[in-house]
Amino acid sequence: MSVTMREMLEAGCHFGHQTRFWNPKMAPFIFGHRNKIHIINLEKTLPMFQDAMKYVRQLAANRGTILFVGTKRQSREILAEEAGRAGMPYVDARWLGGMLTNFKTVKTSIKRLKDMEAAKEAGALETMSKKEALMFEREMLKLEKSIGGIKDMGGVPDAIFVVDVGYHKIAVTEANKLGVPVIGVVDTNHSPEGIDYVIPGNDDSSKAVALYVRGVADAILEGRANAVQEVVEAARGGDDEFVEVQEG
């Protein structure tokens, strides 16, 4: 589903930060200012957003994994929801240092969480004392909160999508270090450096955040659907091209 300029305006994607907090590297994407607030040029944002979505579609069509990152209060819920809809991993609580660069260690925690889930399913809590069961539940809850969204990721993702690149600087740095492409919403108070697909826009409004996140989830689902369609058409095409030659 394509996003329009009107939708971006209605979601407030054009509202940047206070002019005194600006990052000069965002100057090419700033239209001007009103009441000491920078206004982002949506004529720049829209094509850049479309370009990012094109990349997302291609990646999804090739069965790539995109990790959604958004741990701020206004993005947590919608991010987890939309990543789930797209069948992608996500980080909606604190970013743990080394989540990408030290994935081996993270894998150990994922295994622990999965083992605990399996044990609970098998009725292990019933054999524990009240105190043991409480400790078990507490640990499991803590693990679920920090790594529940990435427990099925399997390895380093093919790309990461970040809402508010300044707030998630560690995630961006880790992705850059590993050469993992970054799709990022960049507000007027942050730098677009290190972001492969820059989406200049408001990263604080829950309406704006919902628009970006839904857009990425839609692009993933479209990419997958297109890939399936191509396989079906290729199979059909193969049937059409086969012509039996009569002998004699």
Curated annotation (Swiss-Prot):
Molecular function GO terms recorded: structural constituent of ribosome
Keyword flag Ribosomal protein: yes
Transmembrane segments annotated in the record for this chain: none
Keywords, ordered alphabetically: Ribonucleoprotein, Ribosomal protein
Example GO biological process: translation
Keyword Ribonucleoprotein: yes
Domain of life where this protein originates: Bacteria
GO CC list: cytosolic small ribosomal subunit
Entry's family note: Belongs to the universal ribosomal protein uS2 family.
Name of the protein described by the UniProt record: Small ribosomal subunit protein uS2
